[in-house]
From Swiss-Prot:
Entry keyword annotation includes Aminoacyl-tRNA synthetase: no
Keywords, ordered alphabetically: Ribonucleoprotein, Ribosomal protein
A biological process term (GO) from this entry: translation
Name the UniProt record assigns to this protein: Large ribosomal subunit protein bL35
Claim: Ribosomal protein is one of the keywords in the record: yes
SUPFAM superfamilies membership: L35p-like (SSF143034)
Family named by the database record: Belongs to the bacterial ribosomal protein bL35 family.
Region entry Disordered, spans: 1-28, 36-55
NCBIfam families listed in its UniProt record: rpmI_bact
Gene that produces this protein: rpmI
GO cellular component: cytosolic large ribosomal subunit
A Pfam family per the record: Ribosomal_L35p
Entry-linked InterPro entries: Ribosomal_bL35 (IPR001706), Ribosomal_bL35-like (IPR021137), Ribosomal_bL35_sf (IPR037229)
Amino acid sequence: MPKMKTHRGGAKRVKRTGSGKLKRSRAYTSHLFANKSTKQKRGLRKASLVSKGDQKRVAQMLTYVK
């Protein structure tokens, strides 16, 4: 059986933390900042964890990502 391949798009977007959780950046951060509040923009800078329902699917995409 051939080797599984890492999903390259997913690998660029998600990192694994030291404890094995999957860390991702937030959406809505590329443009249209004039109509977002300062508090909202500050919150968008923080990284977030992949939700529990998506963890299995994302982990499968990132087979070899450490």
